[in-house]
């Protein structure tokens, strides 16, 4: 809560190995805050994330962090951002007004006309241009030293607006997780209408009742009787919904852009039943469909698909913590997307 605005924050992993999880979250955002390291500048992964934000049409603010240890100037950092698009505008308080409005005017014809007529650009026009992804506001600071944070929050309060919501129920599932008691939690964003406890939700070939609606803040939560449009909540009682599913009038998320690039074979220690290990991995796959867990009956092998070593370590840790299974994996191999489909003849 800041000023008169209440924000629901969805933090996503910054490491490239968890890009698929980040992508799933983008489909439920009203706005995104893209954090860039001032000490490292624009990285390839920054460009990948910005392309994903473009694909999902998410209005985007930028916070350039670690300016207390930055080796690059503001001008150099803004130059790096502008290589991804022209309309990254410095919203810092120290920017001269004429320079600020000049930059905004170059981003849309409407703002250009208003600037030429009045010498300024009203907040409503700026807000609309941000919503339409014509402008990407940039703020500078240091999260560690709390520098620039109030300025950023004030900018979010001033230049964001609640998007229009319909009356008929719609929701988008973005995460599946089990609570400490083993209850399956279906995390969703209510995109329109309202969800009430005991409402029956329908999916592809299934219909299940929402037993409980939880609003989480960290590890703590409170139960509510209903969740209105715009709210992010976790619902118990659903067993068939998966990340990316659309409920009610909401369409499902498009096929993900980012897919695993490596395949690993599970190495089971002596005495561990393969089917028990498969069941555990299937539960992890329920939360992360990109794992693509497969079982080869002939070879008695389990294979999973991952983005890299960091994600592999997390999977091993989850298997040990949640299921008591100390499972190893082989060196892994590249997932080739092309293969020979017919007879070929070598010459030479």
Residue ranges and their predicted role:
Residues 18, 86-91, 122-123, 159-169, ...:
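Active-site phosphate-binding and catalytic loops of NTP-dependent enzymes
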Residues 5-18:
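Switch II (G3) loop of P-loop NTPases
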Residues 38-180, 201, 233:
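P-loop NTPase catalytic nucleotide-binding module
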Residues 19-40:
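Inter-motif core of Ras-like GTPase G domains
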Residues 11, 25, 33, 46, ...:
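Residue-level signature of catalytic and energy-coupling elements of molecular machines
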Residues 159-161, 166-263, 301:
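Conserved nucleotide-binding/hydrolysis modules and their immediate coupling elements
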Residues 3-7, 27-33, 107-111, 256-268:
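Gly-rich Lys/Arg/Thr-decorated short loops/hinges at beta-loop-alpha junctions or inter-strand turns
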Residues 252-348:
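Charged, conformationally dynamic linker/hinge segments
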């Amino acid at each position: 809560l800041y000023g008169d605005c209440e924000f629901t924050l969805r933090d996503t992993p910054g490491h490239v190995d968890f890009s698929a999880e980040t992508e799933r979250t983008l489909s439920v955002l009203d706005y995104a805050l893209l954090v860039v390291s001032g000490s490292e500048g624009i990285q390839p992964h920054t460009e990948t994330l910005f392309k994903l934000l473009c694909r999902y049409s998410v209005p985007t603010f930028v916070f350039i962090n670690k300016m207390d240890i930055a080796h690059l100037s503001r001008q150099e950092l803004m130059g790096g951002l502008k290589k991804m698009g022209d309309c990254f505008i410095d919203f810092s308080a120290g920017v001269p007004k004429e320079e600020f409005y000049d930059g905004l005017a170059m981003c849309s014809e409407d703002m250009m006309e208003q600037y030429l007529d009045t010498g300024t650009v009203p907040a409503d026009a700026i807000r609309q241009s941000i919503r339409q992804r014509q402008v990407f506001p940039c703020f500078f600071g240091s999260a560690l030293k709390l520098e620039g944070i109030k300025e950023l929050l004030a900018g979010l309060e001033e230049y964001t607006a609640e998007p229009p919501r319909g009356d008929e129920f719609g929701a988008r599932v973005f995460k599946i997780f089990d609570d400490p008691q083993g209850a399956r939690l279906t995390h969703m964003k209510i995109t329109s209408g309202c969800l009430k406890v005991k409402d029956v939700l329908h999916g592809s070939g299934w219909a299940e009742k929402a037993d409980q609606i939880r609003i989480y803040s960290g590890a703590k939560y409170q139960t509510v009787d209903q969740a209105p449009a715009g709210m992010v909540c976790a619902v118990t009682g659903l067993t068939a919904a998966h990340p990316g599913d659309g409920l009610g009038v909401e369409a499902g998320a498009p096929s993900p852009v980012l897919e695993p690039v490596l395949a690993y074979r599970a190495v089971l220690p002596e005495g561990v039943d393969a089917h028990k290990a498969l069941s555990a991995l299937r539960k992890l796959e329920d939360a992360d469909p990109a794992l693509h867990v497969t079982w080869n009956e002939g070879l008695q092998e389990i294979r999973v698909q991952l983005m890299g070593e960091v994600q592999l370590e997390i999977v091993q840790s989850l298997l040990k913590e949640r299921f008591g299974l100390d499972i190893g994996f082989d060196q892994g191999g590249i997932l080739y997307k092309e293969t020979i489909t017919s007879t070929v003849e070598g010459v030479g």
